Amino acid sequence: MANNNLWTDSYWLLLMQACKKKPDDVKSPWSKTMVDLAIELHIHPKTLFEKMEQLLDHKTASLQKIWDTYADNPRRLNKDAKRVREMKGFGDADSFFMGVESIDSFETFYLPVADDTKLTPASLTILIDLYFMLTPNTMVEETPEVADVARMLTLTTKEVVEVLAIFQTFDPILKRKALPTSALVEAARKVWDEYANDTQNMNDKKERALAYYHK
């Protein structure tokens, strides 16, 4: 869990901004809105979720003032939130990562596995779940489930099929020839090793990933 000492009161404006995104409500801690802000601030989504609940309750005088000032004034909110983001040192990863490993693992779940791809451990988690739902002869671009997942992850059907083909090389039943080593192959191997014999873990992580990619 994130250290609360990374939190500053100026971040209330960024939370208010996230809160006012449609629909106006407490976002799931794993929604794209919350995760992207958590990565930006280097604060765990669950911590931000707790803060957002406090903001919505606005039971303290300071939070009530923020609510009165910005809740119905989106122009001022966006202007002042932009100023917060422009502050010197905002989102400074170097100062954040010193001695903090647990948040690194949360962030990397949503970050690309290589510079030349937008695939992430989160999207690979959804794709390995798809893999176990299909048979090899249905792991093709024409399969509706392939198209649906591609659309959700903003990938091409070709990219989805390529990842499914990588997973096939790890499947001991299929005995496919190994592919040349690459960052994507290694990331897919890591996902396979984590989930292939741990369905509960895969389902838990899949739900988290789906919350992020849900439109």
Regions found by a protein language model. Give the residues of each.
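Intrinsically disordered, charged low-complexity linkers and terminal tails
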Residues: M1-K215
